[in-house]
Design a protein with these regions (language model features):
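Basic, alpha-helical terminal appendages of large translation-related enzymes
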Residues: 9, 15-30, 34, 39-280
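Short, small-residue-biased leader/transition segments that mark boundaries at the very start
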Residues: 1-3
Length: 280
């Protein structure tokens, strides 16, 4: 068995199709009911693709999960013409389809974290994120124009530099005059919550592990669990065990019911925003 052979972390491992595992993964009873209704009842043997269950969970979590900002692979962004020591608030909706849930304040400062994939020194065609000379909107914040980057001795980019346009802040008069294609999420470096995040994926690479004469252990997905340190908006520090959120642009995450502590939650990915296993 996977559990006894230490391929997983016990019967409540979020990758396992057990009730305790599904609960720890952040799956909801409503999502399971939608799954049962979708597949129906049949007396004949049938094989249901795992993506059907994931789709049901996405639909349910999309409706119920408040939105938050998380940077999973952080790269420093420095706004050179933003006053040092200055801070202000930007305002983000808790749920875009539920205005009754209100908005929350997100702190903004001179140094931010952005996703590493959101910068390219030599971008491919059709790349609308940050690169030297290009402008993007920092979601809920300002429009910025990239002016360059810093690298270490190995050539790895360690920081990106930009300038901002003070009259471009989202929600203020005249902000819509700035027409840009890129819209990036970010977290203030001074306020970010450095958090353990567990990126779970399917336990097996094959839809029918061990089929035929194969050893099912050989079908295990070596990338089914990745642990990273992410930079999260500070509001997420107050999350309670089993609180669920959509991390914008990433997917749906749950505060782990076993390892989270007051003021220091640990998050696990329940499901991505779209099916990463889809063919074509």
């Amino acid at each position: 068995m996977c559990s006894s052979d230490l391929h997983v972390d016990g019967w409540d491992d979020p990758r396992l199709p057990t009730l305790v595992g599904a609960r720890r993964r952040g799956y909801t009873p409503e999502g399971f009911r939608a799954f049962a209704e979708r597949i129906g009842v049949s007396k004949a043997d049938s094989w249901i693709d795992y993506s059907v269950l994931e789709d049901c969970m996405r639909d349910d979590l999309n409706a119920r999960a408040e939105r938050r900002i998380a940077v999973l692979d952080p790269l420093k962004l420095v706004i050179d013409n933003y006053p040092e020591g200055q801070e202000e608030e930007c305002f983000a909706p808790n749920h875009p389809q539920k205005p009754e849930l209100g908005k929350r304040a997100v702190p903004f400062s001179r140094e931010l974290w952005i996703e590493r994939e959101d910068f390219a020194e030599n971008p491919p065609k059709g790349y609308f994120r940050l690169f030297p000379g290009n402008s993007v909107r920092l979601r809920y914040g300002f429009v910025v124009k990239c002016t360059g980057c810093e690298k270490d001795a190995s050539g790895k980019v360690t920081a990106v530099h930009c300038e901002y346009f003070p009259d471009s802040k989202s929600g203020t008069p005249g902000a819509d005059a700035y027409k840009v294609k890129g819209n990036l999420h970010w977290v203030s470096a001074a306020h970010a919550y450095a958090c353990e995040v567990r990126l779970y994926d399917r336990l097996f690479r094959e839809p029918n592990p061990g089929a035929g004469d194969r050893d099912y252990i050989a079908d295990l997905n070596p990338q089914s669990k990745e642990i990273i340190t992410a930079c999260l908006e500070p509001a997420l520090k107050q999350a309670k065990p089993e609180d669920r959120f959509q991390f914008e642009r990433h997917g749906y995450f749950v505060a782990d019911r076993m390892d989270s502590k007051p003021g220091a939650p640990v998050f696990s990915r329940a499901v991505t925003l779209k099916d990463s296993w889809a063919k074509g």
